[in-house]
Swiss-Prot record:
Keywords for the protein's UniProt record, in alphabetical order: Cell membrane, Membrane, Transmembrane, Transmembrane helix
Membrane topology (UniProt): Single-pass membrane protein
One Pfam family recorded for the sequence: DUF576
Compartments reported by the entry: Cell membrane
Species assigned in the record: Staphylococcus aureus (strain MSSA476)
Alphabetized InterPro entries for the sequence: Csa (IPR007595), Csa_sf (IPR038641)
Name of the protein: Uncharacterized protein SAS0186
NCBIfam families: SA_tandem_lipo
Length: 257
């Protein structure tokens, strides 16, 4: 009888210890996520940059892993892609180069269309642009008025978005490597997120499309200055081609999507 009682006491002790340890680990993981989100909030609070020409006066993060052949240059890139069955069907891409030395912003707007049935019908067009007084203007004449208006009205999320609102989602996972300062955020966003609303309105994406987000970059998470940022939105609807929006701000290195 005594041995039986000791057995149950030991079992109860093991269960209690397991609960305490598991609870402690859960709280530690939750606290770490809160801490990382607070750090990312400091980084994302430096946006929006409504006037791209203010980047002339902003220093970036020199990544020692990159060979900087093009010093003191910001690269801003965005792309809207339609992907079906692992193949690119359509892509609109804007790339701007912000030269801090010459105080000039130049770049191009590219359009790519691939025909599923006939590869010879695929098209690629590029339109050189520059930024003057925070407005995108063409360096060559564009005859299509709709396309011209679309490009001239182009805005990046770093200009018009609410990036800190991404952190309001309860379905996010954040990781950070303090030895390299690389971080990664991934998860789902609701249709109420202002960035999701803006992109769906801009690109006529179905309202019921689910949205996944991924944010990659390099930062000490103290918000001291602008760092390399790469932002991805994945929109999916049953029976529809996937839509991907990408945007990046990088210093002295062209983003590699």
């Amino acid at each position: 009888m005594k041995a039986h009682k000791i057995f149950w006491l030991n079992l109860a002790a093991i269960i209690i210890i397991s609960i305490v340890v598991s609870g402690g680990m859960f709280l530690a993981m939750k606290w770490e996520q809160i801490h990382l989100k607070d750090g990312l909030k400091k980084v994302l609070s430096t946006y929006p940059i409504k006037n791209l020409e203010t980047l002339y006066e902003i220093d970036g993060h020199d990544n020692p892993h990159y060979e900087n052949n093009d010093q003191d240059t910001w690269y801003i890139e965005s792309s809207y892609s339609v992907v079906g069955s692992d193949e690119l069907l359509k892509e609109d891409r804007m790339l701007l180069k912000v030269d801090k030395n010459t105080h000039k912003i130049t770049g191009e707007y590219d359009t790519t269309t691939n025909d599923r049935k006939n590869a010879t019908d695929s098209t690629y067009k590029s339109y050189p642009v520059k930024v003057v007084n925070n407005k995108i203007v063409f360096t060559k004449d564009v005859k299509d008025p709709a396309l011209k208006q679309k490009i001239e009205n182009n805005q990046f999320l770093i200009q018009s978005g609410d990036l800190t609102s991404i952190l309001n989602s309860n379905d996010l996972k954040v990781t950070h490597d303090p030895t390299t300062d690389y971080y990664n955020l991934s998860g789902k966003l609701s249709n109420d997120n202002p960035n999701v609303k803006q992109l769906k309105r801009r690109y006529n994406i179905p309202r019921n499309a689910s949205t996944k987000v991924e944010l990659k970059g390099m930062s000490d998470l103290k918000g001291n200055n602008h760092q390399d940022q790469k932002l991805y939105f994945y929109f999916s609807s049953p029976g529809k081609d996937q839509i991907i929006y990408k945007e990046s701000l990088t210093y002295n290195k062209l983003s590699e999507h």
